[in-house]
């Protein structure tokens, strides 16, 4: 389900790249998140996109998020955020599931999954509970701590791209929680 939603959001982003490649032959009225949403609606129809994402959220919640991989959870909320859609119930359910996984040390998250999760919440102004940010910051600290504090090697093995760290910091700033 996460990959299906991801593909719809990615398609909208790629459509914008095509429009940008056409240069002066095309005039965009909007840019950024709104343009991605509009492109998606033009390609698939607004009712279809909204309907698909609402039904996907319902299915995810009824199926149970414990069955989803970390990447599925990350991809699902990323797709919603990329299109500028907020489904409060799904975001809250994902928040609770991720928090449970992080605090109970049930699974290892990759840096991209963590940063995309927080980026998604910040992008749609979902305002997660402070305990969600606390769980993320504790997990990152635990994964990166050495005997003498933070080891750069561990930090770079968790967050392989600078953009992931930037998204993490930006997400914390937007939701107003500073670990």
Task: Please annotate each region the language model reported.
Residues 1-179:
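Eukaryotic RNA-binding helical-repeat scaffolds
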């Amino acid at each position: 389900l996460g990959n299906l939603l991801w593909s719809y959001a990615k398609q909208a982003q790629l459509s914008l790249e095509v429009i940008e490649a056409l240069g002066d032959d095309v005039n965009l009225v909007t840019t950024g998140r709104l343009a991605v949403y509009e492109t998606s609606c033009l390609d698939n129809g607004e009712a279809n996109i909204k309907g698909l994402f609402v039904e996907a959220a319902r299915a995810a919640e009824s199926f149970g998020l414990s069955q989803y991989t970390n990447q599925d959870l990350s991809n699902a909320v990323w797709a919603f955020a990329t299109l500028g859609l907020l489904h409060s119930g799904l975001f809250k359910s994902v928040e609770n599931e991720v928090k449970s996984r992080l605090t109970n040390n049930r699974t290892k998250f990759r840096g991209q999954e963590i940063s995309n999760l927080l980026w998604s919440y910040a992008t749609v102004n979902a305002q997660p509970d402070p305990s969600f940010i606390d769980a993320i910051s504790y997990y990152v600290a635990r994964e990166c701590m050495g005997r003498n504090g933070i080891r750069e090697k561990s930090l770079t093995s968790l967050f392989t791209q600078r953009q992931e760290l930037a998204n993490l910091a930006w997400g914390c700033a937007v939701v107003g929680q500073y670990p």
